[in-house]
Amino acid sequence: MISASALNSELINKIAQDFAQATGLAVVVVNIHGDEISELFNFTPFCQLMRQHPQHSTRCRMSDRCGGLEASKSDQPCIYRCHAGLTDFSIPLVIAGHLVGFVLCGQVRLSNDVELVNILNVDDRWQADPELLNEFRNVPEMDYSRVIASADLLKLIVENCLKKQLNFVVIKDNPQQSEANKTTRGPTPHDSKMKKALRYIDAHLSDDLRLEDVASHVYLSPYYFSKLFKKYQGIGFNAWVNRQRMVSARELLCHSDWSIASIARNLGFSQTSYFCKVFRQTYQVTPQAYRQQINENSHPPSL
């Protein structure tokens, strides 16, 4: 559910639609989890079919997220090859100093041979589907120089139009938490501060998150914020942050090809060994063993 603190969806959709029509590229805006928060513009039939398939759509979502995270590291456009082998690029969307999502474009095949970042290892299992294979061959080709020019243009549009006119942040509220809050109590003066704090945490999981910094962000003393946070969430600040990081870690282990060290680093852990320790405490299995279990379950032995 989109919270009341939402981006101007009309503005987002207008810009995305105009850019898609002008360039012939597919465009979508996603939040930091890879969930779509705009309409889908100019999507190829191939990508539409892929996103309708439960397993393939999960890889699409993770590809969107990983591509966005790569772009956010340098705050520059990142041109990459998606899990299905198409060329995409992403632009980080930073509002009021906070990473809130990514603008993703592409869904083209390059007409010239260029070495690109493989954001996830190319997964060719979809090629067993004749319909998908046929639609892939119909995906339009584009010269790499035109992709670069399009990425640079979109960067300018995001910087000079989108960011300057947006005052709010898109997040996906936790539905269970929202319903629980509705049934157990009415709104309180601190509800908005807690939502703001949770948004900040969500957007900074890859940073060195300290309670003092989040408390300062919502204009509360660390002591009072600590008590308030535990009252609202039921657990302490550090435990909550680690839990959110472990949820993201499990998704990345399932659906990305990043090394365990890369996952740890992108989730704010300076030491891989500590990341592995927290993961094992949470799920009673090491990250490596968890990924191996997932791979074994998704690759049944051939007859």
Swiss-Prot record:
Residues 212-233, 260-283 bind DNA. The keyword Transcription applies. PROSITE patterns: HTH_ARAC_FAMILY_1, HTH_ARAC_FAMILY_2. InterPro entries: Homeodomain-like_sf, HTH_AraC, HTH_AraC-typ_CS, PocR_dom, Tscrpt_reg_AraC-type_HTH. One of its GO terms (molecular function) is DNA-binding transcription factor activity. Signal peptide: none annotated. Residues 195-293 form the HTH araC/xylS-type domain. It comes from the Bacteria. Pathway: Cofactor biosynthesis; adenosylcobalamin biosynthesis [regulation]; Polyol metabolism; 1,2-propanediol degradation [regulation]. Keywords: Activator, Cobalamin biosynthesis, DNA-binding, Glycerol metabolism, Transcription, Transcription regulation. One of its GO terms (biological process) is cobalamin biosynthetic process. SMART domains: HTH_ARAC. SUPFAM superfamilies: Homeodomain-like (SSF46689). Disruption phenotype: Increases expression of the entire cob operon about 90-fold irrespective of the growth medium; expression retains its sensitivity to vitamin B12 repression. Cells lacking this gene are defective in aerobic and anaerobic degradation of propanediol. Gene3D superfamilies: Homeodomain-like. The keyword Transcription regulation applies. Positive regulatory protein of pdu and cob operons. Positively autoregulates its own expression. NCBIfam families: TransRegPocR (NF047788). This is Regulatory protein PocR. It comes from Salmonella typhimurium (strain LT2 / SGSC1412 / ATCC 700720).
